């Protein structure tokens, strides 16, 4: 047993694949270093100074003032937009690759059954009429039937409603899945604009879910 204060690294012996053996276990250099640092910290020494290579950056928003973590990092401007497969109101797939060569605006939100989300779809429906060669896609976890009902009732004709109810990985690829909070499992409010070459040129993660996005920024 290695007691705190004893530098156990000197007892390690090189094993297969250039790993070090300590008792019945093998450690690579990074693991051995980590164990030594843990021993130093236990003895009241310095804090670990190596970054955690497996650390995942999580984006954070708020819901009525309370922090909400997203499962992953929100997509950044300048990167290639990941392809996705959503479901249209007729239950056929909608893929980003199907829209290649056109400008795409993704209006992402939690649910059509909230006033703010419904307002965003109405606003983008008006904007879409004046945006040349642009496809505006309304994305949420609502069922395709709910999307169809809303668009029929509200007279939405310039927006393509699309559902992520099949958990196809869209939320993970774009970093918009709420990992906790009252709306856990739904999509955070965001707007992503993709140019004709498939690059993200605008990415807006709305800080407060109960507030509307910046429409002007998305329309530029």
Where are these regions (language model features)?
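Short linear motifs in low-complexity or flexible loops
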Residues: 4, 9-14
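Alpha-helix boundary/capping motif
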Residues: 18-19, 28
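Short, Lys/Arg-enriched N-terminal segments with co-localized hydrophobic residues
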Residues: 27, 33, 41-57
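Chalcogenol-based redox active-site neighborhoods
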Residues: 52-220
């Amino acid at each position: 047993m290695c007691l705190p204060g004893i530098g156990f690294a000197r007892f390690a012996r090189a094993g297969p694949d250039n790993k070090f053996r300590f008792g019945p276990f093998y450690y690579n250099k990074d693991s051995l270093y980590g164990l030594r640092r843990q021993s130093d910290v236990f003895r009241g020494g310095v804090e670990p100074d190596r970054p955690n290579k497996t650390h995942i950056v999580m984006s954070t928003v708020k819901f009525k003032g309370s922090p909400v973590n997203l499962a992953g990092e929100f997509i950044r401007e300048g990167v290639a937009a990941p392809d996705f497969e959503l479901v249209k109101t007729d239950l056929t797939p909608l893929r980003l690759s199907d829209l290649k060569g056109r400008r795409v605006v993704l209006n992402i939100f939690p649910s059509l059954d909230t006033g703010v989300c419904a307002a965003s779809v109405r606003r983008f429906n008006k904007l879409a009429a004046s945006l040349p060669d642009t496809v505006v896609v309304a994305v949420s976890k609502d069922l395709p039937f709910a999307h169809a009902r809303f668009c029929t009732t509200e007279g939405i004709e310039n927006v393509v409603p699309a559902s992520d109810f099949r958990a196809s990985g869209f939320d993970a690829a774009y970093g918009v899945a709420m990992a906790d909070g009252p709306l856990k499992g739904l999509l955070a409010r965001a707007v992503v604009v993709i140019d004709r070459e498939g690059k993200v040129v605008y990415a807006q993660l709305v800080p407060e879910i109960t507030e509307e996005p910046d429409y002007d920024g998305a329309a530029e």
